[in-house]
């Protein structure tokens, strides 16, 4: 790399030749920081052209926040929708987040919940609202922000049907997931983690707290 130019290494070219889009996407992820956002975008574009769904989603984030390229909400949504249609959890979650937030000027709670449900279905299947014990799916802890959103919306006052039991299970997954992120030095999640802790302590969960705390805290 030289200035704003991106020069592919021999290994990069080999990855392209072997259709290893994950290598190219991961190269972009490693460059995703303020001083090299532009380079990250170019690697994401290349991996996306190779069909990497995570890079398509990552380009959505770049356009949403203007990282390495000019912010463009319309393009961000387009990339997120493409990735979500291909089963990307983060893209579906982010669509839910964007539509659920006043910040972007397109708030639509029904649309927000639609995409949160879609994101959850990518992790635990389409039957998760029909009695599935969410606590058993540790895979959810890779997506703490999704779990926080679902826990919040299933709680009293949320925009989904109220399900205290399932809300608490999602929140406990969010708690564990955020703990892992913070332990890995990702301080950006500190505020969300505190929000989860505050909601978990709410009295609406008093009758089920002991049951699930014992389950989730078993391996801590």
Enumerate the predicted regions with their spans.
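TPR/TPR-like alpha-solenoid repeats
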Residues: 30, 62, 98, 153, ...
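Terminal, low-structured helical/coil segments at or just beyond the last alpha-helical repeat
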Residues: 178-220
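Hydrophobic face of amphipathic alpha-helices that form TPR/SEL1-like repeat modules
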Residues: 22-33, 58-65, 94-101, 147-156
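Short coil/turn and helix-start
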Residues: 30-35, 49, 67-71, 85, ...
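Alpha-helical segment of the N-proximal tetratricopeptide repeat
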Residues: 3-4, 10, 14-39, 46
């Amino acid at each position: 790399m030289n200035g704003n130019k991106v020069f592919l290494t021999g290994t990069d070219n080999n990855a392209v030749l072997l259709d290893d889009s994950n290598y190219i996407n991961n190269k972009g992820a490693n460059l995703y920081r303020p001083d090299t956002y532009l380079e990250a975008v170019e690697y994401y574009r290349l991996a996306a052209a190779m069909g990497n769904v995570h890079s398509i989603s990552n380009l959505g984030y770049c356009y949403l926040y203007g990282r390495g390229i000019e912010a463009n909400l319309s393009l961000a949504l387009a990339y997120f929708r493409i990735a979500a249609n291909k089963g990307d959890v983060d893209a579906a979650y982010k669509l839910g987040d964007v539509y659920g937030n006043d910040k972007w000027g397109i708030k639509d709670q029904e649309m927000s919940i639609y995409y949160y449900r879609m994101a959850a279905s990518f992790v635990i299947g389409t039957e998760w609202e029909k009695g599935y014990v969410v606590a058993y799916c540790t895979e959810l802890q890779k997506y703490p922000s999704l779990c926080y959103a679902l826990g919040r919306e299933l709680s009293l006052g949320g925009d989904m049907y109220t399900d205290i039991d399932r809300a608490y299970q999602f929140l406990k997954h969010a708690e564990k997931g955020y703990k892992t992120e913070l332990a890995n030095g990702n301080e950006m999640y500190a505020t969300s983690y505190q929000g989860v802790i505050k909601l978990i302590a709410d009295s609406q969960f008093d009758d089920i707290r002991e049951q699930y705390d014992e389950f989730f805290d078993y391996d801590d």
